[in-house]
């Protein structure tokens, strides 16, 4: 994978359970009509430190509140995460929190843990409660199947409309210690996070102080999961949980570890966009020249979220006016006279003026990316310069097709 060619980190097998100190499982509890895997469990060693980021939507599932409460109560010392897919358990009234409490209490008893050491994440159709009898019946096989090799089943069990599993693991030496990082995620539609991904989980076998780990995860999430958009909609259940366990890492290696965490998180975030409902093309937007990094991020993310930009990419239409219009709609000030735009290596605007370009070549470039026939890159690149500074931000999106409409028009019918 070219993603890691310049990194000291190497890809390995194992996914979320590749780091030491973690076990996982995934089973079919009958929560989905398809009988596919729908219940996942991740269990950590006693000394693990958990950091979580969650949806910023005012409409959110009760399991989010429970996770926040327990992370605060335990100072991040949680031991297990239960994930059910197919039912979001959001907007279900008091039953939502009651069911979350019942599920985590039952699991805590089976794992011989305290209730507050168990978290729950739910994903699926909003307004649908969890079929609790099926979930509770599925806990015994879920616990029984816990293993070091269970990461792949867990990655499958958290999926909903996803077409592919999203998991990864890497390893690298930090000093004389071999450190491993694993991750898994789910997401395909309702993707426009304002803190994390739809559901994402990360593990690491290097210990860090709580304040260091929390700050590190905030930065990692901001430049990965917060930088993607499939359809501009933020979920009620967005959750990202990151676990660090093991001997405390020497502080001189913190930066190197953060690079590894960003690699894993960026890979998972891009996988979500690549698997966007009905999507054919992953595209990357680079924005440079703003006075603040936050301004560059806002512009890049707005372009990625624009339906007009997304449909133009789907149709292989090099309509740079849509790119510029999306950038201008953010409220971030910049001088039009300093704006230059590239689609791939083709410049289409320079210092606020249109540039004559070979339209056929640009269209061919766009078609090659969509069909996977471009030898140099697997994603379409849009570059925008809006000023003279070296500040730069990147975001990722996918094209918007008629298939997306079909998938979501029929989602609950």
UniProtKB/Swiss-Prot annotation:
Keywords: Acyltransferase, Amino-acid biosynthesis, Arginine biosynthesis, Autocatalytic cleavage, Cytoplasm, Multifunctional enzyme, Transferase. The gene is argJ. HAMAP family: ArgJ (MF_01106). The active site is at residue 197. Its main location: cytoplasm. The record marks 123-124 as: Involved in the stabilization of negative charge on the oxyanion by the formation of the oxyanion hole. GO terms for cellular component: cytoplasm. Substrate binds at residues 160, 186, 197, 277, 408, 413. This is Arginine biosynthesis bifunctional protein ArgJ. It is an enzyme of class 2 (transferase). Pathway: Amino-acid biosynthesis; L-arginine biosynthesis; L-ornithine and N-acetyl-L-glutamate from L-glutamate and N(2)-acetyl-L-ornithine (cyclic): step 1/1; Amino-acid biosynthesis; L-arginine biosynthesis; N(2)-acetyl-L-ornithine from L-glutamate: step 1/4. Its EC number is 2.3.1.35, 2.3.1.1. It holds the Pfam family ArgJ.
């Amino acid at each position: 994978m070219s993603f890691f060619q310049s990194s000291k980190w190497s890809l390995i097998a194992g996914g979320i359970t590749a780091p030491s100190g973690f076990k996982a499982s995934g089973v079919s509890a009958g929560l989905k009509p398809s009988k596919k895997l729908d219940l996942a469990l991740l269990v950590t060693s006693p000394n693990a430190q958990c950091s979580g980021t969650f949806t910023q939507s005012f409409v959110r599932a009760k399991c989010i509140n429970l996770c926040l409460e327990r992370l605060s109560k335990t100072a991040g010392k949680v031991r297990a995460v239960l994930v059910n897919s197919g039912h979001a358990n959001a907007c279900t009234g008091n039953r939502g929190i009651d069911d979350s409490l019942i599920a985590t209490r039952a699991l805590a008893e089976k794992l011989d843990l305290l209730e507050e050491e168990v978290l729950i994440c739910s994903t699926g159709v909003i307004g649908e409660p969890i079929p609790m009898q099926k979930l509770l019946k599925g806990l015994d096989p879920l616990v029984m199947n816990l293993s070091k090799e269970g990461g792949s089943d867990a990655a499958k069990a958290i999926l909903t409309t996803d077409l592919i599993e999203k998991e990864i693991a890497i390893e690298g030496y930090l000093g004389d210690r071999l450190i491993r990082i694993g991750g898994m995620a789910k997401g395909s539609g309702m993707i426009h996070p304002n803190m994390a991904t739809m559901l994402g989980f990360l593990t690491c076998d290097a210990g860090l102080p709580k304040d260091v780990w929390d700050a590190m995860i905030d930065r990692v999430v901001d430049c990965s999961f917060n930088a993607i958009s499939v359809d501009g909609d933020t979920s009620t259940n967005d959750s990202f949980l990151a676990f660090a366990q093991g001997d405390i890492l020497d502080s001189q290696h913190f930066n190197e570890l953060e690079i590894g965490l960003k690699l894993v998180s960026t890979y998972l975030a891009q996988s979500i966009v690549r698997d966007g409902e009905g999507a054919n093309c992953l595209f990357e937007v680079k924005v440079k020249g703003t006075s603040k990094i936050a301004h560059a991020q806002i512009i890049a993310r707005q372009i990625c979220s624009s339906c007009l930009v997304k449909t133009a990419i789907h149709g292989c239409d090099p309509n740079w006016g849509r790119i510029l219009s999306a950038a201008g709609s953010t409220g971030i000030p910049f001088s039009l006279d300093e704006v230059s735009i590239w689609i791939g290596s083709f410049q289409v605007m320079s210092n606020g003026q249109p540039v004559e370009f070979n339209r056929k070549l640009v269209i061919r470039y766009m078609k090659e990316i969509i069909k996977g026939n471009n030898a140099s890159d697997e994603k379409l690149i849009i570059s925008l310069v809006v000023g003279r500074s070296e500040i730069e931000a990147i975001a990722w999106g996918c094209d918007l097709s008629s298939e997306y409409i079909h998938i979501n028009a029929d989602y609950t019918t």
